[in-house]
């Protein structure tokens, strides 16, 4: 007696889970937040982006085994008049990416204030520190390259944040930023090689001087580099980004 066929038409399709993950992009104006978002989601680069007015967002789906991950990426305009919209990009975000322009050291100094205000709104988000425009950095004086690299390493250590130098113009480390974000959120093992040589596009995510999610001696580390823990009330009045404290 023939055995009934169990062809493909009779198979039950695998059930896929879907998870939406919010990622906030914050930093000074014209550091490359929109450029990073559009490059990652649409693989498009345009050096003539206009400044973001308020908050922009795009979505991208990635798949891990039987799960579809929807990245909902929030891009906050860096002008001071949009600081009241900071909660849109930070509250509910699993990851907050702090961006600075590698060719403008003042934008790295501003990270102190961005971090203070963002952390006051969402102290459970995973921080990632990203230096943009690496393709322009390599044309600058080697002494400056070393200075900005070492200073950004100190910031990343205090924040206990992965540090990544990227270039949207040259497609350097763009995908890796979000792979690292995904791995940090879901505690996945990463095999991406780290890059920690001065002059190269830094990519450091393992040896951060503490446990994941900044759950180490936070108050002591912030004090040593002037990155302070915010007051317990997120609504308390704080200096605008760009004001060094």
Curated annotation (Swiss-Prot):
Any GO MF annotation of the entry: GTP binding
GO cellular component entries: spindle pole body
UniProt binding sites for GTP: 27-34, 75-79, 132-135
Taxonomic lineage: Eukaryota, Fungi, Dikarya, Ascomycota, Saccharomycotina
Presence of the UniProt keyword Transmembrane in the record: no
Residue numbers spanned by region Small GTPase-like: 16-244
SMART domains: RAB, RAS, RHO
GO biological process entries: cell division; establishment of mitotic spindle localization; mitotic spindle orientation checkpoint signaling; negative regulation of protein localization to nucleolus; positive regulation of exit from mitosis; positive regulation of mitotic division septum assembly; positive regulation of signaling; regulation of protein localization to mitotic spindle pole body
Protein role: GTP-binding protein involved in termination of M phase. May play a role in triggering the degradation of G2 cyclin to inactivate M-phase promoting factor at the termination of mitosis. Acts upstream of CDC15 kinase and may be required to activate the CDC15 protein kinase pathway.
Low complexity bias spans: 229-245
Organism from which the protein derives: Saccharomyces cerevisiae (strain ATCC 204508 / S288c) (Baker's yeast)
Protein name: Protein TEM1
Quaternary structure and interacting proteins, as annotated: Interacts with CDC15 and AMN1. AMN1 and CDC15 compete for association with TEM1.
PANTHER family in alphabetical order: PTHR47978
Keywords: Cell cycle, Cell division, GTP-binding, Mitosis, Nucleotide-binding
Entry-linked Gene3D superfamilies: P-loop containing nucleotide triphosphate hydrolases (3.40.50.300)
Miscellaneous comment as given in the Swiss-Prot or TrEMBL entry: Present with 573 molecules/cell in log phase SD medium.
